[in-house]
Design a protein with these regions (language model features):
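Conserved active-site segments centered on acidic
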Residues: 1-79
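Short beta-strand scaffold positions
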Residues: 85-86
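Phosphate-binding/catalytic loops
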Residues: 92-125
Length: 125
């Protein structure tokens, strides 16, 4: 049994990598009835549509990204929430800026690997 009821992927803007990662996890780990899988952004001033390239990639894989970006807030954290980021800088930023932050890991750290994941935003399809 999973100890988390919420899994979040946190990126800068929540318009590309995070929502795509959440959609992939929901697709391959169909726990959406018991575990909330979503994404948030560190700098979301107002809801933005998804990056068109990301929507195209998702669509090609049979995934749907029909949402707008959401800002990370204190209420997103808790002992039942697992939060993933791409690199140590974002992880440290979360711990610096959110007093309720707990269970924040880089994806590689969570699987006991060193390093960060390079954000592919702006790259070729």
């Amino acid at each position: 049994m999973l100890e988390y009821s919420k899994i979040l992927f946190v990126t800068d803007t929540d318009t590309s990598t995070g929502p795509l990662a959440a959609a992939i996890l929901r697709h391959y780990l169909p726990l959406e009835k018991t575990v909330e899988i979503d994404s948030r952004g560190l700098a979301v001033l107002f809801p933005e549509p998804m990056n068109p390239k990301t929507v195209a990639i998702a669509s090609a894989k049979g995934l749907t990204l029909d949402r707008t970006s959401d800002q990370l807030v204190e209420e997103d954290f808790g002992t039942d929430a697992l939060v993933f980021v791409l690199d140590e800088t974002k992880k440290q930023s979360i711990y610096d800026d959110y007093s309720e932050a707990v269970n924040v890991y880089t994806l590689k750290e969570y699987i006991n690997e060193a390093g960060s994941i390079i954000n592919p935003d702006g790259g070729e399809l």
